[in-house]
Amino acid sequence: MKRFTKTMAALGLAAVMGTGSAFISLADVTTSVNPVATSRKSGWVDVQNHWYYFDANGNPVKNQWIQDGNNRYWMQEDGEMSKQKWVYTEGQWYWVNAQGAQASNIWVEDGGSWYYMGGDGRMMTNTWLENNGTWYYLTETGAAARGWKELGGKWYFFNDSDCSMANDTMVGQYRVDANGVYIP
């Protein structure tokens, strides 16, 4: 069982143990404190702005999702909740926001590329996406396509600025129809 070394005022510990709250905050102290053995609480524990989740037996949850209300949170190998990062599990990529919640039905910008998290939270890949009346193509890496792209034997152009598919317009000296397909 992993031990957390933190400082905690005796009054703070007594107050935490008396509340029965699922959210526990361990403050600064000079002793070695094991939140599981000390509090025997289940639920969320805040250790100096690092969040952990303990099951009904007081064990830290690791390498899995925690469902809390309408949100899911990824608990890392060390038991800490992931924040503002990619999570790769079961062959899929997910994004968790700054609060640690799994993102869904939302665009995520990372390193100059745009990615779309579907309704189930997975990064969409190798697929068309219609979003608010605009079409996009999400590549094998999940990044939204930019520039010319051949798909199914047809050529399409995706704007560099917002990755949207051009349609019924001229792209340089080339024309694309209402469906975005290059007209030779």
Residue ranges and their predicted role:
Residues K2-P184:
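Extracellular adhesion/carbohydrate-binding repeat motifs centered on closely spaced tryptophans
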